[in-house]
A protein has these predicted regions:
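Short, glycine/alanine-rich amphipathic alpha-helical segment
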Residues: 52-80, 113-132
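Amphipathic alpha-helical interface elements
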Residues: 1-65, 83-90, 94-105, 133-153
């Protein structure tokens, strides 16, 4: 099937998907842990309550829930997770809310918004930096993750 729009090519489209998937994976790491940590969490901090929520909303709920967590290591994890999700949501949203343009003869996305004022191309280098940042944040979240020995599934 021939697309009815200009395409940046499979490699660039793969990078878009890679970033979206990496963010979703980090999000699920945190959401997937809520059940096993439930004895230490406020009753409203559940997968069911957060199903369908934006990544930004999940980030806020995790940080708010940290203040009510009864175990310090769980609170630390929720803060680390909430902070990480807030940051990766911005990266993913930069791509998903960008617009196509032609840069140096190639189709690329261009992020342009007025509040806060910013404009930049979503280049291969931008993807490299964004994916490296998501990976670093995922490692930080995993380092703060309460053990399965202490909190079995």
């Amino acid at each position: 099937v021939t697309p009815h729009f200009a395409s940046p090519g499979d490699d660039y489209l793969r990078r878009i998907g890679e970033l979206a998937y990496a963010v979703s994976s980090l999000e699920w790491t945190l959401l997937g842990d809520l059940h096993r940590l439930s004895a230490t969490l406020p009753a409203t901090l559940t997968v069911s309550e957060l199903a369908g929520a934006t990544t930004g909303r999940i980030a806020r709920q995790l940080r708010q829930g940290a203040a009510l967590a009864t175990a310090p290591e769980v609170a630390t994890y929720l803060i680390a997770g909430g902070d990480a999700l807030a940051e990766v949501a911005e990266l993913r949203n930069a791509v998903l809310h960008a617009r196509p343009t032609t840069i140096d003869g190639e189709q690329r996305l261009y992020r342009w918004r007025s509040q806060p004022a910013e404009a930049y191309a979503i280049s291969d280098d931008w993807f490299d930096d964004a994916l490296a940042r998501v990976a670093k944040l995922a490692r930080q979240v995993n380092a703060a993750r309460p053990s399965f020995d202490a909190y079995p599934a």
